[in-house]
Amino acid sequence: MAKLKTRRGAAKRFKATANGFKRKQAFKRHILTKKSAKRIRQLRGCVMVHVSDMNSVRRMCPYI
């Protein structure tokens, strides 16, 4: 059987942990002036990938 290919874009966006995959928050790149300081602060850091998206991420990154 052929080797599975890793989706390189997904490999750069997700990191594997013991409990699943972690990812960065969205909506924090540009157009930040209209967003409150509280909202920008809450978008800081990483969050875990939702359970319903886990199979998709596993399929895109079989070796991570």
From Swiss-Prot:
Residue intervals passing through the bilayer = none
Instruction: State whether keyword DNA-binding applies.
Output: no
Keywords assigned: Ribonucleoprotein, Ribosomal protein
**Molecular function terms from GO:** structural constituent of ribosome
**The keyword Cell membrane belongs to this UniProt entry's keyword annotation:** no
Q: Which Pfam families match?
A: Ribosomal_L35p
GO CC, any one term: cytosolic large ribosomal subunit
Top-rank taxon of the source lineage equals Bacteria
Which GO BP terms sit in this record?
translation
| Stored Gene3D superfamilies | 4.10.410.60
Family label: Belongs to the bacterial ribosomal protein bL35 family.
Q: Please give the HAMAP family that the UniProt record associates with this protein.
A: Ribosomal_bL35
Supply the name of the protein: Large ribosomal subunit protein bL35
Q: Which gene encodes it?
A: rpmI
